[in-house]
Amino acid sequence: MSFDSIFPLPRVRALGPRNLSAAAALRRVAAFPELIGVLAVAGFLNLWNLQVNGDANTFYAAAVKSMAVSWHDFLFNSMDKAGLMTVDKPPLADWIEALSVRIFGFNSYALLAPQAVMGIISAGLMYDLVRRRFGRVAGFAAGIVLCTTPTIVAMSRHNNPDELLVMLSVAATWCFLRALETHRTKWMVWTGVMIGLGFETKMGVALMLLPAFFLAWAWVHWDRSLGVRGNLAWFGQALWGGLALAVVGLAWPVLMWLTPAADRPWISGTTDNSIWSLIVGYNGLGRVSGQAGGPGGGAGGFGGRAGAGGGGAGFGHSTTGGALPGFSGGTNPFSGHGGRLGGGAGGGGNSTFGGNTGVFRLLNDALGSQAGWLLGGAVVAIIALIALTRLRRKDPNTGFLIAIAGTLVVVGVVFSFAS
């Protein structure tokens, strides 16, 4: 039973690529008035009076301005025009913003509109993701909830990379659902591509989708009667998805690894100028242990000084691990500033993210008003889906449930106990 059986809507043909003409595409979209409503609400909330946010996060804005005028800085995600140091994140979000600024000039709309559009796309994808399995009314509700969640609206009007990660995560889930429905390898590959692009946006955070996705894939496809050899086909499909993730997600890190240190900026957030330290340390375990500072906030300052918005842990830490590019003999050009590249690159106000760790952290004053208030509804929806699917194997609805609920658990645990 779907929500459409309770609140019926006119039956129309599903969206698809059969007729690629613009007029046909518009007619198909017009046949889904609820989708138009979702996109309209998202567009209004994300784009209205966007210029009021100015340059938003000035650290990323400065980096984008540098990247917009230099292809070298663009390629290596440099935070400054001199190509001295990279941003402390992968480049995908900055690349999109820099291309926009290169085309339209440096202004609030050119800087922030890409994220606003990503928020609109996310809402549309969420609508179709839920509609495919549970009907148009449910899809409309899902799209509206996503595009009106306060923290989603805020990030859609900001130049932090979070909104791109949201869009890619929803896109990965959409592709994964298509894989569950069709059992075709190409959709697993596309799932891997989307998660890989998410890795190029915020590194390890994007990988939190993987445990639940693999469990859902195995639950729907595992057939005990076939034995190990008989189950190799679906496992091989998962491996193809993993290969796509690795190729896409590691493309830029491998470029940084293979480029001589003298020919590229210093890798921010590291003591040894290693991209792998950035992945595993600053943007990996450091985010869990609290060694990397909190997310968000303003640009960090040099010499251990607090940056705009009270930057947390430093760009890096001590620079004794090697010479900065352009300075010979291990010279540290910032030795007069305490020998440190301080203030978190875009670091948050304090080193503790969202208050004290614990089971109820997502419901505290800092996080509850942003998205924590949705957790109760999410739990009710999961219980309803369990009753609806009865966890039947071979049922895409069951796979959808495991993927969504499992991701909620993984993300909830990580953000509840990360320091």
Each predicted region: which residue ranges?
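Membrane-integral, polyisoprenol-dependent glycosyltransferases
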Residues: 1-292, 302-419
